[in-house]
Amino acid sequence: YYTSGLLRTEQTLAALYGDVPHVQLPGLREMDFGDFEMKSYQQLKDTAAYQAWIADVEHNPCPHGESAPQVLARNRAAMDRVLAAGEDAVCVIHGGVTAGLMMTWFGGGRYDYSVKPGTGFTVTFENGRPVSYIRVPK
């Protein structure tokens, strides 16, 4: 069992699987929104920094935060560590992290892999490569 170590993933793991031993991998955390953290759309919408970021959220980093490619690289490195263990694993992670990894592995867009709390995907790997997935629960 793996989580990002952030509260939501810890709570979700406990709700789904109980008090199980697990590894916290900070590399599985969601995007660091930097200066935008804990601010609402209403607070940000008219700022130049937010407008610059929103113009290309896939490539522009949040001020003092991360870009989507930076997050994905961090997430992929963490998943490589999970896969290197060569065992079945349960990863309780964030929706954006899930979407980014699934897009990398299977193509498509982020909304193809939207998840609700407590849901996700079972991904089958062969020789370290993703070969199929199913949505859980169905």
Where are these regions (language model features)?
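Phosphate-coordination/substrate-recognition cap region in phosphate-metabolizing enzymes
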Residues: 1-49
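Short beta-strand scaffold positions
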Residues: 3-4, 73, 92-93
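Alpha-helix capping/helix-boundary segments
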Residues: 8-9, 78, 97-98
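Short glycine/proline-enriched coil/turn segments at helix->beta-strand junctions
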Residues: 16-22, 84-88, 107, 128
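A polyampholytic, Gly/Pro-enriched intrinsically disordered region
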Residues: 41-54, 130-138
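Short glycine/proline- and acidic residue-enriched helix-loop micro-motifs
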Residues: 49-70
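Generic beta-sheet signal
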Residues: 86-96
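Domain-level recognition of soluble alpha/beta enzyme cores
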Residues: 108-133
